[in-house]
């Protein structure tokens, strides 16, 4: 009889640990309420004007009372998650709803501080718009016994309708940097010597922050880790000081096309503290006026002038969202310059007026052969114009 009893208890325990495929294992909290909510994601605009970056295919929602996780639920939908329904939780005041989308974190049982301390690193997978992490956090609100609905339209049947008509905002952790277009209009003094073909060129992030936080007013991490898409001679912007790391990330390099670019993470440029700028660069062969590779003695002359390296490659670097170099800006630059901010798309229009440089990680003359216009919009897009 005892064996039968223990066997039945074991089956009951197994049944209690089983969970719905849409749910994390729930915290051990006595529940008397549920929370459902609608989300609002940012404007649908990706680096290549692809809309897939706005899609949420996995969303984890957590309910917190102070540091205690009182409820958690994960929903996965290939077609996109727009809401999460019926999160079991406990009623009470000063509850906070925290969400993380498109992630691979283990979140069950984590305190609020632990979740808000999570970080992410820039990887090749991030250049696929489907793998962009998004986060959101509500203001404190009261959960009442029964059904609670957050962000649903007014008139929704509910025991407690919170933030009626205003869904929970969920925003991307990443930012976008891209070339909206590159034109070549060689100035008079160069027309008889040089040309450049963007269609045959490549683009790369010369300097990009490797990691960031996923929550907070600023996501800039306190690490000094950076990535590059193509190796160039060291310069003033190169992360080579003590304590800094600078690693190759091949996904930060691709062929030039209108709208081509990369997803990057928040960063801040501060020369006094050796915080590096984010640099987007187009590079390729510096050609003669007829569009042919340079030959001697023209190649040596161009190398000596600092226009290209030994194999004739010239670089046109742009410091993204930099306040200087004669860059022209338009759009919603509401969060300042000399930094990369989450959920912003920095679209750079480039007008090449002369040869580039062989030291793209060094400061360039203000009157360099580059006109830059940058637009910032909320996805947010920043349009930046540069002239070389």
Curated annotation (Swiss-Prot):
Example GO BP: cell adhesion
Lipid attachment locations (N-palmitoyl cysteine): 19
GO cellular component: cell outer membrane; pilus
PTM comment, free text: Synthesized as palmitoylated precursor. Efficient export to the outer membrane and integration into fimbriae requires lipidation and subsequent proteolytic removal of the lipidated propeptide.
Proregion span(s): 19-45
Entry's Gene Ontology molecular function annotations: structural molecule activity
Signal peptide: 1-18
Family matches, as InterPro entries: FimA_C, FimA_N, Fimbrillin
Coiled-coil blocks: none
Region span, Important for oligomerization and fimbrium assembly: 379-388
Keywords, ordered alphabetically: Cell outer membrane, Fimbrium, Lipoprotein, Membrane, Palmitate, Signal, Virulence
Residues anchoring lipid (S-diacylglycerol cysteine): 19
Domain of life: Bacteria
Site (Cleavage): 45-46
Keyword Membrane: yes
Disulfide feature: none
Compartments, record wording: Fimbrium; Cell outer membrane
Predominant place of localization: other
Quaternary state and interactors: Fimbriae are composed of a major, structural subunit (FimA) and the minor components FimC, FimD and FimE. Head-to-tail oligomerization of FimA molecules mediates assembly of the fimbrium stalk, while the minor components probably form the fimbrium tip. Linear, head-to-tail oligomerization of FimA is mediated by a conformation change, facilitating the insertion of a C-terminal beta-strand into a groove in the N-terminal domain of the following subunit. The anchoring subunit FimB limits fimbrium length and is important for solid fimbrium attachment to the outer membrane.
Other comment: Strain ATCC BAA-308 / W83 seems to lack fimbriae, probably due to very low expression of the fimA gene.
Protein family according to the UniProt entry: Belongs to the bacteroidetes fimbrillin superfamily. FimA/Mfa1 family.
Protein task: Structural subunit of the major fimbriae. These long, filamentous pili are attached to the cell surface; they mediate biofilm formation, adhesion onto host cells and onto other bacteria that are part of the oral microbiome. They play an important role in the invasion of periodontal tissues. Fimbriae and their constituents are major virulence factors. FimA proteins from different strains have highly divergent sequences, and this has been used for classification. The sequence-based classification correlates with pathogenicity.
The name this protein goes by in its record: Major fimbrium subunit FimA type-4
Organismal lineage: Bacteria, Pseudomonadati, Bacteroidota, Bacteroidia, Bacteroidales
């Amino acid at each position: 009889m005892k064996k039968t009893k223990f066997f039945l208890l074991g089956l009951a325990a197994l049944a209690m640990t089983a969970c719905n495929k849409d749910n994390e294992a729930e915290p051990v909290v006595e529940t008397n309420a549920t929370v459902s909510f609608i989300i609002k994601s940012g404007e649908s605009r990706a680096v290549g004007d692809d809309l897939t970056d706005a899609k949420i295919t996995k969303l984890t929602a957590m309910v917190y009372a102070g540091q205690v996780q009182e409820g958690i639920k994960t929903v996965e939908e290939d077609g996109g998650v727009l809401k999460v329904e019926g999160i079991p939780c406990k009623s009470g005041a000063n509850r906070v709803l925290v969400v993380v989308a498109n992630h691979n974190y283990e979140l069950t049982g984590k305190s609020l501080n632990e979740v808000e301390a999570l970080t992410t690193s820039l990887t090749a997978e991030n250049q696929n718009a489907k793998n962009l992490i998004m986060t959101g956090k509500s203001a404190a609100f009261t959960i009442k016994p029964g059904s609670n609905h957050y962000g649903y339209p007014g008139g929704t049947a509910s025991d407690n309708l919170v933030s009626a008509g205003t869904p929970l905002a969920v925003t991307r952790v990443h930012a976008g940097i891209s070339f909206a277009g590159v034109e070549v209009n060689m100035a008079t003094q160069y027309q008889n010597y040089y040309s450049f073909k963007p269609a045959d060129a490549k683009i790369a992030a010369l300097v990009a922050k490797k990691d960031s936080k996923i929550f907070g007013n600023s996501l800039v991490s306190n690490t000094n880790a950076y990535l590059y898409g193509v190796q160039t001679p060291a310069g003033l912007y190169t992360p080579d000081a003590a304590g800094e790391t600078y690693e190759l990330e091949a996904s930060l390099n691709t062929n030039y096309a209108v709208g081509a670019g990369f997803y990057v993470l928040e960063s801040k440029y501060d020369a006094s503290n050796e915080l590096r700028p984010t640099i987007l660069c187009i590079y390729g062969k510096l050609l003669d006026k007829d569009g042919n590779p340079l030959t001697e003695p023209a190649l040596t002359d161009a190398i000596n002038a600092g226009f290209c390296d030994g194999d004739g490659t010239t670089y046109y670097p742009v410091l993204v969202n930099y306040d200087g170099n004669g860059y022209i800006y338009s759009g919603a630059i509401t969060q300042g310059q000399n930094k990369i901010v989450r959920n912003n798309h920095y679209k750079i229009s480039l007008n090449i007026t002369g040869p580039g440089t062989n030291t793209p990680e060094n400061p360039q003359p203000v009157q360099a052969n580059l006109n830059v216009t940058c637009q910032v919009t909320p996805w947010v897009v920043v349009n930046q114009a540069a002239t070389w």
